[in-house]
UniProtKB/Swiss-Prot annotation:
It comes from Aspergillus niger. Keywords: Cell membrane, Cell wall biogenesis/degradation, Glycosyltransferase, Membrane, Transferase, Transmembrane. It is found in: Cell membrane. This is Chitin synthase 2. It is a multi-pass membrane protein.
Length: 189
């Protein structure tokens, strides 16, 4: 759940940044209403229970609701929707409006079976993409922590040039507290 909360809290910090752009024609204080965070878990038995606990703490998930068969038909996925008012940081501390966190619209898709990453992308684009009709999609893997303004800069690349069809961000290894991560040769390289 640490990697998950690191990523989601980073996204929520980015939403806060977008909402702080008071002179923007697109963003501003209600900018959060233009963003939907879609989380896709690849298999009900595969997702870590503590990740589900984190989602439940945010109000997004309810334990015991999902069933694998309904009316004698196999269920493929379970979808939960909630607008959360709080975030969990990587230290599992709640952060809310008092820390500047804006509301966040969350769609959580818990796939019944593990069918790997490309299937999850298919779910995102074919199911949620068709329903939401987004202008821009940003895909993040769990554990990736976007810098506080990273999503703004990705969005800006699309906004400034309608011919841009894709953009990529730079990934930097986290050095850890006191740069102790540099003791790991993979991080240090």
């Amino acid at each position: 759940e640490i990697g998950f909360t690191r990523t989601l809290h980073g996204v929520m910090q980015n939403i806060t940044h977008l909402c702080s752009r008071s002179k923007s024609r697109t963003w501003g204080k209600d900018g959060w209403k233009k963003i939907v965070v879609c989380i896709i878990a690849d298999g009900r038995k595969k997702v870590h229970p503590r990740t589900l606990n984190a989602l439940a703490a945010l109000g997004v998930y309810q334990e015991g609701i999902a069933k694998n068969v309904v009316n004698q038909k196999q269920v493929n996925a379970h979808v939960y929707e909630y607008t959360t008012q709080v975030s969990l940081d990587p230290d599992l501390k709640f952060k809310g409006a008092e820390k500047g966190i804006m509301p966040c619209q969350v769609l959580f898709c818990l796939k019944e079976h593990n069918k790997k990453k490309l299937n999850s992308h298919r779910w995102f684009f074919n199911a949620f993409g068709r329903a939401l009709q987004p202008n821009i999609c940003i895909l993040l893997d769990v554990g990736t922590k976007p810098a506080p303004t990273a999503l703004y800069h990705l969005w800006k690349a699309f906004d400034q040039n309608s011919n841009v069809a894709g953009a990529a961000g730079e990934i930097k290894a986290g050095k850890g507290k006191g740069m102790l991560g540099l003791l790991n040769p993979l991080v240090a390289s």
